[in-house]
Amino acid sequence: MTKPTPNEIGKGYDAFADLLDQLWGENLHHGYWDDESATLEEATTRLTDRLAGMLPLRAGDRLLDIGCGNGEPAIRMATANDVMVTGISISEKQVERANDRAYKADVDDRVVFEYADAMELPYPDASFDVVWALESLHHMPDRWHVIRQAARVLRPGGRLALGDFLLVPSPAGLEADAERVREVGKGVVAVVSLDEYQAHLREAGLEPESAEDVSQYTRPSWTKAAERFEGLREQALQHIEAAQFEVTLGRFRAFSEEPSLGYVLLTARKPD
């Protein structure tokens, strides 16, 4: 299945912005459940905090958020760590909403959101202390190219922080696992093993640092999303055909039962 172009992805997010907000809440990414009673909104915030906690953020650091969504993670980090954040998205509606959110949070003096394509970052070399990509790289036509772009705009000593889907090996072997995930996801989610991921980081000139497999804590996201999506059937059918609704709902449920579809939090450092 051919991956959608960045322009198609951006238009898709524009078209379904309201529905996505109802589905995921403030954060358009998975949640982290170390407490089974946590709501989806609480769990997604915990995942943001979990990845941010893997970084030595300092006041005044410049951070680039690739795939900023509605801007909540960027605003949260700016508020908690006094960093300067530039967030980018290929969804004009997300950029508009994120800037409005930053204004209302009174952080628009240090948080700005721009329309930009991560495949061709419009920033000079060595211009950021941190590049952050929380669950956005799987949308990219070539995630390894984006990582090379991230390495380019990082300053020496800067760090890349990622949250991404991971291929968790089973006795069937990686090739069989990858094929099964591809079949379930129909090209929506492409995954590789941790070893392959870290090899690509090294090829981009980055030194892998921390890697935390959080699959068991993020897996409930699929079940929660399926439950909430089912409850949004009436609203969803205003945007998509009934057949597509059932395909999407079925995919959420299939992902929740697929043991080889995992989730990893990674950091890597650009050498001095």
From Swiss-Prot:
The keyword Oxidoreductase does not apply. GO terms for molecular function: S-adenosylmethionine-dependent methyltransferase activity. It holds the Pfam family Methyltransf_11. Optimum pH is 7.5-8.0. Its EC number is 2.1.1.315. It catalyses: 27-O-demethylrifamycin SV + S-adenosyl-L-methionine = rifamycin SV + S-adenosyl-L-homocysteine + H(+). SMART domains: PKS_MT. It comes from the Bacteria. GO terms for biological process: antibiotic biosynthetic process; methylation. Slightly inhibited by Ca(2+) and Mg(2+). Strongly inhibited by Zn(2+), Ni(2+) and Co(2+). The keyword Lipid biosynthesis does not apply. Keywords: Antibiotic biosynthesis, Methyltransferase, S-adenosyl-L-methionine, Transferase. Disruption phenotype: Mutant loses its ability to produce rifamycin B, but accumulates 27-O-demethylrifamycin SV (DMRSV) as the major new metabolite, together with a small quantity of 27-O-demethyl-25-O-desacetylrifamycin SV (DMDARSV). Belongs to the class I-like SAM-binding methyltransferase superfamily. Catalyzes the methylation of 27-O-demethylrifamycin SV (DMRSV) to rifamycin SV. This is 27-O-demethylrifamycin SV methyltransferase.
